[in-house]
A protein has these predicted regions:
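Arg/Lys-rich, alpha-helical DNA-contact motif
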Residues: 2-14, 23, 37, 42-43, ...
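Ser/Thr-centric signal marking residues that sit
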Residues: 17-18, 46
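Residues within the helices of the helix-turn-helix
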Residues: 18-19, 33
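Short coil turns linking two alpha-helices in DNA-binding domains
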Residues: 28-31
Length: 109
């Protein structure tokens, strides 16, 4: 039986307000709004339109902050995040296809 706190274990649960997310990451709220506007980190919205961030989104925002701290403009950091996401998806697809090709015996033909 799922309890009311189980959602907090979900990395996609939108538990953080913009202010709290900014505080946790050590960034300004404007930085998070810029990531949202650029499409790099799209928080969920409440019925009233307020942003709510998940732990997974905080990790993406932290990576964007790391890239900006390295000297990349925000737009470049957003593009890098998108490319890293694409690469991860392609790697997962490649791994799945290799497993399928290997078949039940673990060897390819």
């Amino acid at each position: 039986m799922a309890g009311p706190l189980d959602a907090l274990d979900d990395p996609d649960y939108p538990a953080y307000t913009t202010g709290r997310a900014a505080e946790v990451l050590g960034v300004r709220q404007a930085f998070l709004r810029a990531l949202d506007a650029g499409g790099a980190v799209r928080p969920q919205r409440t019925a009233g339109g307020r942003r709510r961030y998940s732990r997974r989104q905080l990790a993406l925002a932290a990576r964007a902050r790391e890239l900006v701290d390295q000297g990349h403009p925000v737009a470049a950091a957003q593009r890098i995040l998108a490319l890293e996401d694409d690469l991860a998806a392609e790697r997962a697809l490649t791994a799945r296809l290799r497993r399928q090709h290997a078949g039940p015996g673990g060897r390819g033909s």
